[in-house]
Amino acid sequence: MNRIDLKKLIIPNIPYLLFVWLFDKAAQAFRLSPGADLSGKLLSLGTGFSAAFSNAAPSLHPMDLLIGIAGAVLIRLIVYFKGKNAKKYRRGMEYGSARWGNAEDIKPYVDPVFENNVILTQTERLMMSSRPKQPKYARNKNILVIGGSGSGKTRFFVKPNLMQMHSSYVVTDPKGTVLVECGKLLQRGGYKIKVLNTINFKKSMHYNPFAYLRSEKDILKLVNTIIANTKGDGEKSGEDFWVKSERLFYCALIGYIWYEAPEDEKNFTTLLEMINASEAREDDPDFQSPVDLMFERLEEKDPEHFAVRQYKKFLLSAGKTRSSILISCGARLAPFDIRELRELLETDEMELDTLGDRKTALFVIISDTDDTFNFVVSILYTQLFNLLCDKADDVYGGRLPVHVRCLLDEFANIGQIPKFEKLIATIRSREISASIILQSQSQLKAIYKDNADTIVGNCDTTLFLGGKEKTTLKEMSELLGKETIDSLNTSETRGRELSHGLNYQKLGKQLMSEDEIAVMDGGKCILQLRGVRPFFSDKYDITKHPKYKYLSDYDKKNAFDIERYMKRRPAIVKPEEPFDCYEISEADLQEDKP
């Protein structure tokens, strides 16, 4: 460490040895000049310089050396104080250095192979690899897409990225149009297609959240998701005490089902039946409902059972209080009274934990006008993120073999995913990414409150497709920064004589002001990538994509029929499930011919 400090001290001062030599020779010249006094020596100074510089070696006379060193020190002090008090000029950047990015700025972030990129604009792309040759160019694939209604969020972002087919995809599909338009293409590419349709249950595959419970902490996550995305309509359902009591009750019932129920009864139908069988009487504290008796028998068998411990805490409340809690629970799960929804959630065909194993496309179709069943979608996404993270850590050493991209269109309508601000910060390393698609940033703040900024901060890329919401316009304008411009002022003075004046000065101006962003051309977009100048580019022309001809946009014959696909898909057989296997020879086929 001392050696390094010594180098820093000596090396910058080496040039000042020249001044030691110059002042030394000047002192020698003055000393060698003939003359009895100062004026005489000055008059014959030329003779002294000739004598002094006849030999290039420095004078070793003590006075000459002292003057040489003193002169060099004086020069060093002048340079030091001049540097300390120097004016810091940034010519042309007095008020800011913002500018639009160009092809050279984005070049290090683009993979030469077109298919290995995330499509952002017509001219900008982002490589899928999270480990480029130079680590400083690594960026996460979390993208915040903002665009008002009709700005082309689906056409200019979702569909072009589906056509890249380099990952597994989870797509929120309002109205179900993306599945129809892109399903055939994905099927041709060897993708397994999964569909959860909360608009038309007949066109949906089954999804059973109980099939993905692996531990007691998964039970807690499921209960928290249900409570966060549903409302109990009881008188006191919004108060903290009542919500905590409901949580205990749900944990007890779901814990009982997960541990004790037969495999075909591990679903929400059983949960509803248990809630319906629960009862509390204010006037009879000794009354026991069928559910009370079930837990009593379970306690006799295993007093430390998770479900028993939760239920005993629930029973600490008085009979009247428990009645209110049961009413709130019934109101919260009222949507499950619909038979089609119960049937949808009885069995499971989604195989959520396999999305990172092989290329799969999961389409989550939600209504853009009715959020009644959106809590089911919240449960699915919560389980999906947790399942994939756990599998990446436990099976694949921290990274999934197939990247999973979540294109979360109409993100505000999905509902609240518990701890999403923490999930989005950690999924990157597991080869999972989320594209959050919103109409305005205020939608995110309405759901996630103070955590909205954390979520935005974990998206290295922001793509603005257009809009007029004031908060979004203000934040986009501030994000772009200020540029320095030249201003010319002219003045005219009228009096006895007419005089004119010109004044040039520098001013700071937003690279794009709020009103300019609001009236931005419909074919343009603004892209901001972390660590790079912003881009003002054309939106991606979907018709120029090599695979566009396989979409139903190009040819109606390419429309995907989900009902036909569901009828023809092979049955899902679990590893532990017994089944019969028949071998058919060519001779058997010949015998069957007429």
Q: Can you name each region flagged by the protein language model?
A:
Residues 114-120, 375-383, 476:
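Conserved long hydrophobic alpha-helices within structured protein cores
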Residues 107-108, 114, 375, 411, ...:
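A short glycine-/small-residue-rich loop at the edge of a beta-strand within enzyme catalytic domains
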Residues 52-55, 65-117, 216-226, 274-277, ...:
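Short alpha-helical interface patches
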Residues 126-132, 231-241, 486-505:
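Low-complexity, polar-biased intrinsically disordered regions enriched in Pro/Ser/Thr/Gly
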Residues 9, 139-432, 447, 452, ...:
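P-loop NTPase motor domains
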Residues 424-526:
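Conserved ATP-driven motor cores of ASCE-family P-loop NTPases powering translocation/secretion/packaging/pilus
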Residues 1-151, 155-158, 202, 482, ...:
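Basic- and hydrophobic-enriched, low-structure N-terminal and domain-boundary segments
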